[in-house]
Amino acid sequence: MTTSRRPSPRIRSFVKDLSATIPGAFRFTRGHYSMEELAREAIIRGADRIVVVGERRGNPGIIRVYAVEGPERPDNIVSFIVKGVSLSRERRWGLPSLRGGEVLVARPLDSGVAVEFADAFVIAFHARLKPPEAAGYVEAVIESLDARTVAVTFRYGGAPVGPMLRLGKPAEMVKRGRRV
């Protein structure tokens, strides 16, 4: 998980929150790395996804998820428009103390656009739609706000953790040819 080339302090805090909340994610300081160099770094670290948070007026504006299949330029597979962010420190929530082995579970609260976002979370973050029996998990609770917008709250052990997001659906959220 990384940022655009010259991130604002708020973007850096957001990436820190999000990488601490999503199981298996790690934060990488981008610097002047190109996408190809990010792909090579991901392969070295054993990752198959690169998450890049873009900026809009100093705030998170878009989350792009890329699939890493080799050292060449990664493919953009999922994009989310960020309409609003509330960082964990602003809500006085903590970050989860993940022990390893946890998974991300996407739980839509209603049908329609929340289900579309849950499917996109499965593709982007290897989330599951049902919690596992034995392992711990971080739950991404996805609630529809209107026909194109959802609110995402992360929970660990039933308590809210990490950032709270309002995400919008771009014209093409899941890129062609990608299925759950």
Curated annotation (Swiss-Prot):
GO biological process annotation, one example: rRNA processing
PROSITE patterns in the cross-refs: BRIX (PS50833)
SMART domains: Brix (SM00879)
SUPFAM superfamilies (UniProt xref): Class II aaRS ABD-related
Domain of life: Archaea
TM regions (residue ranges): none
Residue span(s) of domain Brix: 1-178
Stated role: Probably involved in the biogenesis of the ribosome.
Protein name, entry field: Probable Brix domain-containing ribosomal biogenesis protein
Species of the source: Aeropyrum pernix (strain ATCC 700893 / DSM 11879 / JCM 9820 / NBRC 100138 / K1)
